[in-house]
Amino acid sequence: MNRNTESHFSTTPTVDIPRSKFDRSFTNKTTFNAGDLIPFYCDATIMPGDTVKMNMASVVRMMTPIAPVMDNANLDVYFFFVPNRLLWKHWKQFMGENDTAPWKQTTEYEIPQIVAPENGWTKGSLADHMGYPTKIGGYKASALPFRAYAMIWNEWFRDQNLKNPCYISDGDSDITGVDILDPNYDYVTDTEKAAAPCKVAKYHDYFTSCLPEPQKGPSVTIPLGAAAPITFTENKEGINPTTYTYNSNAEGKELAYWQYPGNHDLGYIDTDNNNTLTSIGDMHYGKIAVDLSNAVGATVNQLRQAFAIQKFYEKQALYGTRYIEMIKGHFHVTNPDFRMQRPEYMGGMQIPINMNQVIQTDATSQQVSVKYEAGSPVWSMADKTPQGNAAAYSLTSDRHKDLFVHSFTEHGILMGLCCVRTVHTYQQGLNAQFSKKKFTDFYFPEFANLGNTAVLSKEIYLDGTADDEKVFGYQEAWATERYFPDIVTGEMRSNFDQTLDVWHWADNYTSRPNLSSEWIDETKENIQRTIAVQNHDQFFGDFFFQAIYTRPMPMFSVPGLIDHH
C-alpha cells in the first residue's frame, strides 16, 4: 500500500523515448609504429539509451621488408567505454545535479579544455591520432578524450610492477598541451596533455613476466621468541701483540684501541717517529654466549601467521594489486568493470601480421644489403642478385563481424585502440638447463610448490663477467621445465659477421638488459632493422568501422515540432 494518501502525487510521468538507427560507419587511414598504443576510434558522444553494434575490417601494410621475415607479430585491437563521471569530478553537476544548495545548481560548469601548444601538435601525437588538427597552435578543445586514454592505459596496459601510472587530473582547469617533440616530454605527466602514445608492454613470457622481488611485501621472518639469557666468560689467556710497522702516513697519528675484559681500558696509542706501534702488553678477552635452552619459544599460532602472511604477499605478487585483481586473486570473485569504476572492456581481437615473399625473376646489377656496426644499420650495394632472390611485402587484411554489441546507460567516451607487438625471440643468453649443478636444481615432486626462484641475468644475456650471476628477476619455481624460449642460431645470430638477422625479429642487446620500466616496453627496434625504409612509420593501415548506433533520437530533426518528445 502506498504511504501517501493520494498516490498520484508520489509518482512522475514517464515518456518512452523512441529510438532510431543510424549508420555511423567511417574509415580511418593512419600510420604508426610497433609498440605504440594507438587510439584509432574515439567517439565522445555516447549517451544514455545508445546501443552500438560494431564490425571492423582492416588492411594493414608494413613498410617494405628487406626479406620475408620468419617470425611472429600481431595487431591487437581493443575497445573500451569510459564514463565521463570518472574523467571529470563535476560531470554530474555539469548535467544539473545539485549537491551544494536547494533547488537548482548555483555554479555553471564547462567542459575542461586543452590548449594546443604554441606550434601545434605534430604527426604521431595522441591529438593527431584522435583527429585533432595538427601544426596549429593556441586553439581549445575538450580534454576528456585524453584523460580517457590515460585511464585506459593505467588500468589495462600498465605493467604495475615496473611502470609509474599516468597522472590524470579530474578538475575544471584548462591545461596546455604538450607535443611529442618536446624534449622534456614525460609520459607520466604529459599523456593527458595529448603528447606521445603510451607504450604497450611486451607479451608475457619467461623473462617479461618476471617479478622484481619474490613477494610483494617485506620478507617474512620466523618468530623465535622474545628473549634468551646471555652469559659472559672471561678468558685468562692474554694476547701480547707484536710490533706493527705502518707507512709514513701513520707518523704522529693516533690509533684507537679497546682492551677487552679483564683490563676494560679504552683509549689510544701514539705512533713513534720510527713509524712503529709497539706492544701494549697483555689484553684479555672474554666469550659471550646465548643460552637457547632457556629461550622463550615461538608458538604454533605465530608460526602459522608467518606462513599465512608469506602466502598473502606471494599472491599479491602473482595476481597484482589493482583492487579488481586483488579480489579475483584472493576471493576468486570476478567484478564487472563498471562496478569497479574503471574503463569497461567492450571487445577486441588479435590479427596475425602476414608476410609474403616476392621471388626475383630476373637478375639485377645491384642489390641493397645491410650490416650492423655498433647496433646501427649500414646500407650498401652488392654487385648482383640472381634469379630466385627472395624479397618480401607484408599485407594483412581482416574482417571481423560482431566485434561487440553494447547498450549504454550513461554519458561517456567509446575508444578503440590498436598496437603491434612481436613474439620475442632470444639469442644471447645461456638456457637455465645448462647451468644445473646440484641435485636440488632438478625437479622432484617434493619440490613442486617452492617459492618464486631467481632468474639469473646470464639466462638472457651472457658476457662472461661476474654480472652474469646477478639476479634478473623472479619467476615461479620450475618455470624452466614448463617453458622453452624461441631462439636463433647459426648465421641468423646478430653477432655473426655476415648476419641474416633481417630474416627475424629476435632481441639483440648491445648491453646487459635489466628488468626495468624501459626494458618492459615493446619498441620498434626489432622490426626497424628488417625494413628497407628507415625514415617513415613502420605500418600504415586502412580501418573500416561498420558502426550501427541505435539512439534515443528521431531520424530527422524537423523544425516546428517543438512540443514533441
Predicted segments — roles?
Residues 2-565:
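Intrinsically disordered, low-complexity segments
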